[in-house]
Amino acid sequence: MGKVKALQRLLTRSFSGKALAVRRVTENQGKNTPGVDKVTWNTPQKKINAVYSLRQRDYHPQPLRRIYIPKKNGKRRALGIPTMKDRSMQAIYLLALDPVAETTADPNSYGFRPQRSTADAIEQCFTALGNIYSAQWILEGDIKSCFDGISHEWLLAHIPMEKPYSGNV
């Protein structure tokens, strides 16, 4: 893991990594949605200033801006909106962690995975069922509120990431 951590450190500290993180945050669907600080990075100057402001040292995430969106059943779902800086820091961490996660992830898992789609999952179902020795059934599951029960301590202990940064994840 020494080489992995060295590459992660290089990526998270590099200008290019920071610029890519800012680009992802400022070119996505939520680019005009501010966090609690009411700041958006909507000009080239603000974007370049943002790249230079991203540092892990002394970084502390801000509180989330809480909004409620209506659900089909009439209830409302709470949504927490991070600041642009917090989103960019999360994007930097994702750049460092995603390659590790993708090499160890289940190859037959398709939800929330880069470069995978519903069509890919359906194709895999047909492939699996077409094998003479395959199972006869495919089970689909949805674990309600699964993220509420994930142990953050376990994640921090088992995901390879440089320790000074992992406390901010």
Can you name each region flagged by the protein language model?
Residues M1-V169:
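Non-catalytic terminal/accessory segments
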